[in-house]
Amino acid sequence: ILGGQLANVHSREILRWDVAISAGRFAYVGPDASYCIGPETKVLRWSGYVIPGLCDGHMHVESSMLTPAEFARAVIPHGTTTMFTDPHEIANVMGLAGVKLMHDEGLMQPVNIFTQMPSCAPSAPGLETTGYEICAEDVAEAMQWPGIIGLGEMMNFPGVVNGDPQMLAEMAATARAGKTIGGHYASPDLGSAFHAYAAGGPADDHEGTCEADAVMRVRQGMRSMMRLGSAWYDVETQITAITEKGLDPRNFILCTDDCHSGTLVQDGHMNRVVRHAIACGCDPLVALQMATINTATHFGLERELGSIAPGRRADVIFTSDLRELPIERVIARGKTVALAGRITTECPHIDWPAAARNTVHMGVKKSATEFAIPAPDGGVEVANVSVIGVVENQAPT
């Protein structure tokens, strides 16, 4: 790749440097790659920006209603080359077998899909009817799979705070494997309960909704994950921790959490999140760091991906504008996988078994009257009804 303006996320610089790729990895990154050119070398001349492939630090494929292969096909043209997925929705239905199916299909893709073993399936025991309940033995088994990067979001934060034996056993199995424990602290209480949660093992958290949340997570040694998904708009309210309070941006990560397929088609994926962070006042190179090297470092993969540097996986984006991020070309593991917004590679599927299909069983057929709330007799003008409140652009859990 000759003549490009390289975004160096290690030094936070733009450098007029060349890039040489061999066997799917960066072989040379520097001012003159001409000596790397042989008779069979493919040369790409590009005067625009050359940036690392984007990473989604926390997300659930199932929210899109797509399989991992189809999700990859949707997001690759938007520049996403690495995803850290928590398949806790399929775990609710199929348990460990379902997680393994998602894990296996993820490993087949032309981009990097790492799986976090779900920790809390079901997420609300006793309040939902599920097909399976994840246990500590399941977590210990999954930690041996090649694509497992850690433990998925620890949603049972009261269990962590109060020393629930199952939650502690799941985190212990993850720690023994030397992998990352994902967090989910969905409470405004930043006092003793939060301190206990941070001490329990979770290394990150994406449930923050305001500047104080982001600041406290970083101060307690956690990575603050700021999300922009289809329903989550939590970047703007937290990014002031960087842009105004001046906290070290290397401890912040961008993610989506949940994206509907319509969002992917109409608005994009991680390129949308980076654009949004920049529009909220973040320096473009800082925003890129939060969607590349910061994420890789958090999961122990800094020497493997997340930057354009020698030895790393050759995941690259060509873009003509560092703020708007139009994605002109996407390279993953040294091969062009998307060009001008269209995918140019295959995203293979596993052979999904019959057990993974038609899994919704409603029992007795329901009628509309069963969902009606009858008004009390006797001319009462006021009745108490249990409802679910709505918070605009948030979904506190």
For each predicted feature, which ranges?
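Active-site beta-loop-alpha junctions enriched in small/polar residues
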Residues: 60-62, 88-90, 118-123, 153-157, ...
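Active-site microenvironment of metallo-dependent hydrolases
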Residues: 1-27, 32, 76-78, 265-281, ...
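Divalent-metal coordination cores built from histidine and acidic residues
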Residues: 69-180, 245-247
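Active-site mouth loops of central-metabolism enzymes
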Residues: 55-67, 123-135, 203, 207
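Divalent metal-coordination and catalytic microenvironments
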Residues: 4, 24, 47, 58, ...
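Histidine/acidic residue-rich metal-binding segments in metalloenzymes
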Residues: 132-153, 159-226, 233-254, 265-279, ...
